[in-house]
Amino acid sequence: MNNIVKYLAAVILLSVSLPVSGQTTQISGVVLEDSQSGALPVIGAGVKIKDTSNGSVTDLDGRFSLSAKEGDVLEVSCLGYRGATVTVGKDNYYKIFLEPESMMLDQLVVVGYGSMKKSDLATSITSVNTDDMKIFPAATAAEMLRGRAAGVTVTSASGRPGSTPSIKIRGTRSISASNNPLYIIDGSVASDTEFAMINSDDIESIEILKDAASQAIYGARASDGVILVTTKRGKAGESTVSYNGYVGFQTLHKNFDYYTADEYLSLRREAVANDMGIIDATTVPIATALADDVMAQVYKSGEYVDWENLMFKKAALYHSHEVSVKGGSDKLKAMASVGYFNQDGIMKVNSGYDRISSRVNLDYQVKKWLKLGANTSFGFSKREIENGAFYQFITRSPLSQIYDENGDYIPYINSNKDTNPAYSALHDSHDAKANSYRINAFADIAPFKGFTYRFNVSYYNRVNEEGHSRDSYYPNGGGSTASLLNTTNVQTLIENSIRYDVPIKNENHKLNITAVQSVDKSLRKTLGYSVSNLPVDKTYNYIANGEVTGQQRAYSENNLVSFMVRAQYNLMDKYLFNLAVRRDGSSRFGTDNKWGTFPSVAFAWRASEEGFLKDVSWMNNLKLRASYGIVGNQNGIDNYATLGVAKPMPGEFGDTYYMGYLPGNDLPNQNLKWEQSGTANFGLDFGILDNRIFGTVEYYNTRTTNLLVSRALNASLGYSSMLDNLGETRTHGIDFNATFDIIRSEDLNWSVTTNISQFSGKIIKIDDTVDENGNYVSQPGNNWIIGAPINIYYDYKADGVYQYSDFDVYSDRGSLTYKLKNTVDTDGDGVADAPLSRNDNVELGSVKLRDVNGDGKINEDDRVVYQKDPDATFSLSTNLRWKGFDFFMDWYAVAGGYILNPLMYDGEYGGDLRGRSNGMKVDYWTPYNPSNTAPRPKYGSEVPYMRTLAYQDASYLRLRTIQLGYTLPKKVTSKLKIQNLRFYMTATNLLTFTKVLSYSPEITGNLYPETQQTVFGVNFSF
């Protein structure tokens, strides 16, 4: 499939045929791969007459044809092969051989402020296969990255349309500051929302900077990795129009059983019986069990509400359309694109997403020494928000009355006036809109060979508008209400950079110097109002006509000034050195700590170029790398953390409304300084057996110090907390990726790619406080435990549910008494003489806790760590191509980590049915069903520690993607006057194997389920 994609790309970029002067004739030929595998066709190779725009590309059989005259020089090139030149003679047919590059070692890789050959890299930079990435039909590029690069973890917090997943590069290393990567799009710093808005077909390449040596050139913002995105640009030649679109539908990939009327009645009978001491729950009267006239009437009617069927659609539509135009001349080149994406929510309440995004990239060669360029992007999105409707649905009883006699929803489902979520959704409107644009302009000045100065300026503006309104019919609403919040984010970047390839006569030495100076200013403005008694229901457009009940205003800005210099030295194409240092000054820190210095060093040895390996036929590439660097972190903290900031306090005096101010909650800290991470990275790049097997294995170890942590203060100071530099963490792990080209032939190609990441981390210290033994002290209240991972739950460990076997039974005058068995040896004689001590009443069917430290009692010392982040991730994908057919399959797995499953409990004491107020069917304990999964239900009393049963191993294995495509042969498309035409079908999230009892093994917050998707698409160009 990679060959097909290269062919399609080359067609778009190189298929031009302009007239040339002189006597011309039609020539043809074939381009073949000169390798140990034999003469295989090279698909998508560009064949161009030197110094002209006249060219062609090879088809699926490696063949080409074009007009040329005798004496013309044909330049033949293809990604992954050494170029070749052939002089046109009297012959009309030419057979041209290209020699493969080892692992595509001449492929240019974006490294930040420039690019270089992959073979010359000394740092850890992963190039994402964007062709495979785009196969997954997702709303955002972030979701497409899942499983595409070792060391990169993508997690979905919600399945809601338009939601943006989080990305972590090599795990969590900061306690309070941000752990999100830095995004660079076409050289400009961008946000995750801007990355999410990119049309997938606009992406030319994505590089991920994973070690500190590659990240250090971005200094202050690069501690959590860098994602470099380069978008496509125009090429000289005929204009090419491309379209890629698909239409598909979504369905729930998992369904759960919810209680029927009889099952729910049995549940409530058990709950009442347990509270009232009734042995036989079936004797509890229906009226007593249901305790609600409406519920009793619904039960007698023989009907009940299937909430899952009520809240979910059978299928939800979504579609995507992207159109681009590329072309230009030797002077002016342009690329323009526009895309539209629409996704309907799987829930029947408001939850859709619309996005329009466009891009224009221009390059103008004014003079030989002067080039001007511009990158512009525009985007609009609208997201409908269902306001937690899923949670409301699942916490409602199946014995609910939801319709009136006309079949319309009613506001309350029972006599207790519990609201009807279906009715509430009709009278509640909540949406978020975003408008954004970026204008980036640059000038490249090259006064002499090897030297380029670039002046770059970028302006980004994003306006978010979030509106929420409830009409006068909303249950318990007290009249119509509305709120409107406008947030404006503006970023301005001015950058000067110099890149100089130092001329050295001795070809064994190559030296490149890069220097950068930049000024980055960001500001954020917020304005919001809340009103009541609107003249028009269910709209916030008339918010000015309501009675103001609240307002919000904020303004914040920060500035970053940076200087960077980097030297890259290549000795004999064997020994590679990379030195860099960046100095950043941030307005977020105090006068004495504004500046941070971030150096790095890297070395690589291309062992395969040494004489003792040069003649080893099966060894095509072997490179060893080592690097160390320091990067900074200022993300996730307030712009004014070092200053005393007042907070608004509105008040009234008589009939006059005043806005007053009080001291803020945080004590200002002038000594606040940069959080720093130092990373050592060791890597090995390999390619063997004619590069049929190639990949990378890396080990990294990171130490993060001066953690930006908010610590609690004594209330007598007048402040509740202060941001400070405290503590230290360490993380380490292994990244591995490999590709296996199993079959290479003219008609059949098959390759398999795998990515494996292993990660672990721990907190070394929080502050300098030590106990009597000199050990650093944990802070359990903040879930900061010395020696434990950073991102955790800290809670008791459930051992199931207490069973009959855990008790001794005594009979007193016909009454049975259950006493917990002796399991604790208090006097050390080897005989258990006391039961396990707990601070609550233990009974049959209650939650059983583990005595972790074995001291015979349950207390805070028995709490354990549940790590949220996975221990490892794994992906396996395969590409198979036979003639015009292509097949892709992708598996993804997560090992380790826990989630607190919100479907397994509804809080410790929430709802009238204690501990089990949602309608999802579970196997709860009864005297006749001694389950170990869920405790015995309660009605009016508490079910302590129920949440401990909701910690579940979040490991899963998922068949993530299958795609089948067919590309029409050239002889057909030529008759249709188009360059290429491909049809495809893609299915996602087909199978998931996990122990998590939820709609998704990842989602713990907003309970909007993920979906299974099937799409049918087409792409073509002409």
Q: What kind of region is each of these model predictions?
A:
Residues M1-R359, Y364-V366, K371-G373, R438, ...:
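Short, small/polar-rich motifs associated with maturation and membrane association
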Residues A39-P41, S53, R82-T85, V189, ...:
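Short, solvent-exposed loop/turn motifs
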Residues V47, V76, Y183, Y403, ...:
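Short aromatic-centered micro-motifs
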Residues M133, N179-N180, A289, H319, ...:
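Extracellular/periplasmic, surface-exposed regions of secreted and cell-surface proteins
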Residues S242-Y299, D724, I743-V865:
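Conserved small-residue
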Residues I402-Y403, D471-T481, E652-L662, L713-M722, ...:
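Solvent-exposed loop segments that connect transmembrane elements
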Residues S586, N841-L844, V894-F983, A987:
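Extracytoplasmic gating/loop element in the C-terminal half of outer-membrane beta-barrel translocons
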Residues Q867-L900:
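Glycine-rich, aromatic-lined ligand/substrate-binding cores of catalytic
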